[in-house]
Regions:
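Extreme N-terminal tail/first-helix region
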Residues: 1-16
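Short hydrophobic/aromatic-rich beta-strand segments that constitute the beta-sheet cores
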Residues: 36, 53, 89-90
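Conserved short histidine dyad/triad with adjacent acidic residue
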Residues: 10-11, 19-39, 66, 71-74
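Ligand-binding loop in jelly-roll beta-barrel domains
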Residues: 73-93
Length: 93
């Protein structure tokens, strides 16, 4: 079954699915700043748009261009500065 998720007053939305690929969501984010907490490991890939990421333990935001990924362990938090509306893929580990 496909799960529909909305966060931050509808500024972040995703569709979740589990299949032979694994558990993942495909979503969109409006431009803005967000903080997410993880309950499992995540691999985030920017499909389209522009964002900067502050990974756990860092004070700096780093650019991750379209097609690039970053990984966050379970029970961590990370911050995003989304500079333009974007599309992303999140794979759960």
């Amino acid at each position: 079954m496909i799960a529909v998720n909305q966060y931050f007053d509808g500024k972040v939305a995703s569709l979740g699915l589990s299949n032979s690929f694994g558990k993942f969501t495909i979503g969109v984010m409006a431009a803005g700043e967000y903080e997410f907490n993880t309950s499992s490991g995540e691999i985030m890939t920017l499909v389209s748009g522009k964002w900067f990421i502050q990974l756990p333990g860092s004070t700096d935001y780093m650019p991750y261009p379209e097609g690039s990924s970053f990984e966050v362990a379970a029970n961590e938090s990370f911050k995003l500065k989304v500079l333009e509306d974007c599309g992303y893929l999140c794979q759960y580990k």
